[in-house]
Amino acid sequence: MSRSIHKGPFIDVSLLKRIEALNISGKKEVLKTWSRASTIIPDMVGHTIAVYNGKQHFPVFVSDQMVGHKLGEFVPTRTFRTHVKGDRKARR
């Protein structure tokens, strides 16, 4: 179920303020955030946002195609470790 149109997209207030400040100043710096649920808006395009995955911050460069998606979609939280095939000869 999608979010109601009259509410608008969810964006963390502190993240929105920092994005607006960067747009006014014209600086390019990496913003750290823990808000994986924030929706990417057109103001964020061209910025690099370091999103927390539960262990460390991963830098995400925001492009046009990402608008409307959540920040957490681009940072995996789980690492897949392949199943090691057992060495049967060593067990004997």
Swiss-Prot record:
Subcellular localization(s) per the UniProt record: Plastid, Chloroplast
Example GO biological process: translation
Pfam family, one: Ribosomal_S19
Keywords: Chloroplast, Plastid, Ribonucleoprotein, Ribosomal protein, RNA-binding, rRNA-binding
Keyword Chloroplast: yes
InterPro entries documented for this protein: Ribosomal_uS19, Ribosomal_uS19_bac-type, Ribosomal_uS19_CS, Ribosomal_uS19_SF
Top-rank lineage group of the source organism: Eukaryota
A Gene Ontology term for the protein's cellular component: mitochondrial small ribosomal subunit
GO MF annotation: an example: rRNA binding
Family the entry assigns: Belongs to the universal ribosomal protein uS19 family.
Protein role: Protein S19 forms a complex with S13 that binds strongly to the 16S ribosomal RNA.
Name the UniProt record assigns to this protein: Small ribosomal subunit protein uS19c
